[in-house]
Amino acid sequence: MIPLKDDAPRITTPYMTWLLLVTNIGIFLFEWMMRVNYGRGAEDAFVRVFGLVPARVTIFLEGGHVPAHLVTQLGMHVVSAGPALLPFFTSMFLHASWLHVIANMWALWIFGDNVEDHLGHFTYLLMYLLCGLAGGVTHTLLNLASTVPSVGASGAIAGIMGAYFVLYPSARVLTLVPFLFVFFVWLPAWVVLGYWFVVQFLSGAATSISSSNPSGNGVAFWAHVGGFVAGLVMIRLFPSRPRRYRYGI
């Protein structure tokens, strides 16, 4: 199921959602221009430094030494040099492809404005970043030996989706359903988002059970799960913004 738009009304202008959209797209364009001008190797080197590498975090927490229980798992995989903790933040502003950034920004556009309307601009930004952090931590804890840089705003946006699930469960979402034939249908948000979460959880569980490769399979399902759960919890902890109707702010 692919969400296309929702019918939840908002009062305020989603300035922070717009800023996040512009920032993520702008940084991806920087990555793309780096590839065009200097080759794929330059972009890969940039991503290895600023992407989240769980094995690098594990080694950092072990004081710079590879723990014995990871030696066998790592095998011949090389842990790239770079900061260990900074990528928990920087990785959520990087993306792997045009499809990756478009899909993430589309979801943010659909669900972010209403959550921002509820929380206020800066509380919304704080929650976005915390959900991204939660997604990164979850991914790291369940992939301690992974040497593949994880990038993307998916954990943060999953958190916004989790918050939307709590705030607007009955809002209708126009959804593209590619089942035998492609058709469009309005579905309750709790159905669309609940289905998405179950798919991410089952995919993450299946990958964890079946994969013997510490580099992972390229999709950080557990970051999605961790971010979504963080959004479910945090939206209940953060106060809603005072209602201001003048000037649409």
Whereabouts are the PLM-identified features?
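A detector for small-residue-rich transmembrane helices and their helix-helix packing motifs
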Residues: 1-249
